Protein backbone atom coordinates (compact mmCIF):
# COMPACT_ATOMS: atom_id res chain seq x y z
CA UNK A 1 0.00 0.00 0.00
CA UNK A 2 1.20 3.51 -0.71
CA UNK A 3 -0.13 7.04 -0.50
CA UNK A 4 -0.06 9.41 -3.45
CA UNK A 5 -1.68 12.86 -3.65
CA UNK A 6 -3.71 12.16 -0.49
CA UNK A 7 -5.13 8.85 -1.79
CA UNK A 8 -4.19 5.37 -0.56
CA UNK A 9 -3.51 2.66 -3.14
CA UNK A 10 -3.30 -1.09 -2.66
CA UNK A 11 -1.98 -3.56 -5.23
CA UNK A 12 -3.02 -7.22 -5.32
CA UNK A 13 -2.08 -10.19 -7.47
CA UNK A 14 -4.63 -11.55 -9.90
CA UNK A 15 -5.40 -14.27 -12.41
CA UNK A 16 -7.98 -13.77 -15.14
CA UNK A 17 -10.50 -16.38 -16.26
CA UNK A 18 -8.26 -16.80 -19.32
CA UNK A 19 -5.28 -17.72 -17.05
CA UNK A 20 -3.40 -14.48 -17.57
CA UNK A 21 -1.41 -13.02 -14.68
CA UNK A 22 -1.79 -9.38 -13.73
CA UNK A 23 -2.03 -7.06 -10.75
CA UNK A 24 -5.03 -4.97 -9.76
CA UNK A 25 -5.01 -1.64 -7.95
CA UNK A 26 -7.63 -0.37 -5.51
CA UNK A 27 -7.95 3.16 -4.08
CA UNK A 28 -9.25 4.56 -0.80
CA UNK A 29 -9.42 7.89 0.98
CA UNK A 30 -9.76 6.33 4.45
CA UNK A 31 -8.13 2.83 4.24
CA UNK A 32 -11.57 1.33 5.04
CA UNK A 33 -13.64 1.77 1.87
CA UNK A 34 -11.82 0.56 -1.25
CA UNK A 35 -12.81 0.79 -4.91
CA UNK A 36 -11.27 -0.80 -7.98
CA UNK A 37 -8.90 1.59 -9.78
CA UNK A 38 -7.07 -0.21 -12.58
CA UNK A 39 -5.18 -3.25 -13.84
CA UNK A 40 -1.44 -3.61 -14.37
CA UNK A 41 -0.59 -5.97 -17.23
CA UNK A 42 2.36 -6.88 -19.40
CA UNK A 43 2.05 -6.38 -23.15
CA UNK A 44 2.02 -10.14 -23.74
CA UNK A 45 0.76 -12.96 -21.52
CA UNK A 46 3.29 -13.52 -18.75
CA UNK A 47 2.41 -16.42 -16.48
CA UNK A 48 -1.05 -17.31 -15.23
CA UNK A 49 -0.85 -15.62 -11.80
CA UNK A 50 1.08 -12.72 -10.30
CA UNK A 51 1.26 -13.41 -6.57
CA UNK A 52 2.25 -11.05 -3.76
CA UNK A 53 2.90 -7.89 -5.80
CA UNK A 54 4.80 -5.03 -4.20
CA UNK A 55 5.09 -1.57 -5.75
CA UNK A 56 7.70 0.92 -4.60
CA UNK A 57 10.07 3.62 -5.78
CA UNK A 58 13.79 3.53 -5.04
CA UNK A 59 16.54 5.88 -6.27
CA UNK A 60 14.21 7.45 -8.85
CA UNK A 61 13.15 4.08 -10.29
CA UNK A 62 9.73 2.43 -9.95
CA UNK A 63 9.55 -1.29 -9.20
CA UNK A 64 6.68 -3.76 -9.47
CA UNK A 65 7.77 -6.92 -7.71
CA UNK A 66 5.74 -10.12 -8.17
CA UNK A 67 6.04 -13.86 -7.80
CA UNK A 68 4.89 -15.03 -11.22
CA UNK A 69 3.45 -18.52 -11.59
CA UNK A 70 3.26 -20.40 -14.86
CA UNK A 71 6.49 -19.37 -16.57
CA UNK A 72 8.01 -21.86 -18.98
CA UNK A 73 11.62 -22.67 -18.14
CA UNK A 74 14.38 -21.79 -20.54
CA UNK A 75 17.85 -23.30 -20.75
CA UNK A 76 19.00 -21.73 -17.48
CA UNK A 77 16.29 -19.21 -16.59
CA UNK A 78 12.89 -19.64 -14.93
CA UNK A 79 13.68 -23.25 -14.04
CA UNK A 80 12.41 -22.89 -10.47
CA UNK A 81 8.85 -23.75 -9.54
CA UNK A 82 8.67 -20.46 -7.62
CA UNK A 83 9.88 -17.30 -9.38
CA UNK A 84 10.43 -13.98 -7.62
CA UNK A 85 11.31 -10.94 -9.65
CA UNK A 86 10.37 -7.47 -10.72
CA UNK A 87 9.45 -5.20 -13.60
CA UNK A 88 10.77 -1.67 -13.86
CA UNK A 89 7.83 0.66 -14.45
CA UNK A 90 8.23 3.45 -16.99
CA UNK A 91 5.57 6.13 -16.58
CA UNK A 92 2.68 6.27 -14.12
CA UNK A 93 1.49 2.89 -12.82
CA UNK A 94 -1.91 4.53 -12.25
CA UNK A 95 -2.15 5.70 -15.86
CA UNK A 96 0.10 5.46 -18.89
CA UNK A 97 2.95 3.02 -18.20
CA UNK A 98 5.09 0.30 -19.71
CA UNK A 99 6.84 -2.59 -17.98
CA UNK A 100 10.40 -3.74 -18.59
CA UNK A 101 11.34 -7.36 -19.05
CA UNK A 102 10.93 -9.39 -15.86
CA UNK A 103 14.13 -9.67 -13.84
CA UNK A 104 14.70 -12.22 -11.09
CA UNK A 105 15.57 -11.10 -7.58
CA UNK A 106 17.39 -14.36 -6.97
CA UNK A 107 18.52 -17.31 -9.09
CA UNK A 108 18.30 -19.83 -6.26
CA UNK A 109 15.41 -22.12 -5.40
CA UNK A 110 13.98 -20.78 -2.16
CA UNK A 111 13.09 -17.10 -2.29
CA UNK A 112 9.40 -16.37 -2.82
CA UNK A 113 6.75 -13.72 -2.21
CA UNK A 114 9.10 -10.86 -1.25
CA UNK A 115 7.59 -7.75 0.29
CA UNK A 116 9.37 -4.54 1.21
CA UNK A 117 9.04 -1.63 3.55
CA UNK A 118 10.86 1.63 4.11
CA UNK A 119 12.49 2.19 7.49
CA UNK A 120 12.38 5.48 9.38
CA UNK A 121 15.91 6.25 8.19
CA UNK A 122 14.91 5.74 4.53
CA UNK A 123 16.32 2.26 3.86
CA UNK A 124 14.24 -0.20 1.83
CA UNK A 125 14.12 -3.67 3.44
CA UNK A 126 12.85 -6.69 1.50
CA UNK A 127 11.84 -9.97 3.12
CA UNK A 128 10.54 -13.17 1.54
CA UNK A 129 9.76 -16.81 2.15
CA UNK A 130 12.61 -19.30 2.35
CA UNK A 131 12.64 -23.10 2.41
CA UNK A 132 9.72 -23.87 0.10
CA UNK A 133 8.13 -27.28 0.81
CA UNK A 134 8.20 -28.68 -2.75
PLM regions: where:
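Carbohydrate-active catalytic/glycan-binding domains of CAZyme proteins
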Residues: 1-134
